[in-house]
Amino acid sequence: MERAFLNPNPALAEREYNMTEQRLSIAEEQAEFIDDFNEIDDWMMQYSCLLELTADMKPVSDEEKNEQNKISGCQADLWIILSFENGIVHIRADSDSLIVKGIVAVIAALFDKRTPQEICGAHIDFLEKTPLKEQISTDRFHGMQTVIRKIQDYSTSLTQM
C-alpha cells in the first residue's frame, strides 16, 4: 500500500506551495501520518521512516544553534527557527538526537508553509495515536509538546499584529 505521508512525491516536496494550491489540512496530513506509521508493525522500520523524514529538513546553521533558538525542557539539544514571510510560517529545526529530530521533522512537515491561523487552530496528537509515545521518555514527550506550543505561540503572536 502506498504511504502518502511517509513517501511523499519528491516533485511536490521540492516545490514551494502557493496560496492557490490546494493542500491537505493539518488534521488530514496528521491522519495520513498516523495511518501510515501505524501500518508499520516493526519499531526499527518506524525508526527508519522517522530518520528518512529528517533528510527533507532545511539546515540550521551553527550560528543559529544558540540559546534563543534552543528548546528548554528537552533532554536533547534541540533548536527551532521560525520565520514569517508573505503570510506563511516557515520552520527549520535540528537536534543532536536522531529520534527527536525525526519527531520534530513530522511536526515541521505538518506546520511548515502554513498560515498562522491554520497553525493556531491545529490539534497535534500523533504522538499519542502512534507507538511513538511508548518509545520515548516522558521528558522527550513533554519536550515535543513544548515544540508544538512554541510554534503555535509564535503563530498566535502573528495573528495579533
Predicted segments with their positions:
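A ubiquitous short alpha-helical element
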Residues: E16-T20, I88-R92
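Glycine-rich phosphate/pyrophosphate-binding loops
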Residues: K113-T130
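Alpha-helical support elements that line or immediately flank enzyme active sites
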Residues: V106-R114
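Positions in alpha-helical segments
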Residues: D35, A105-V106
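Short Cys/His-based metal-binding microdomains
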Residues: V100-I103
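N-terminal amphipathic/basic-hydrophobic helices that include classical n-h-c signal peptides
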Residues: M1-N18
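N-terminal intrinsically disordered, cationic/polar leader segments
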Residues: R23-F33, N38-D77, F84-E85, V89, ...
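A short interface-forming secondary-structure element
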Residues: S95-D96
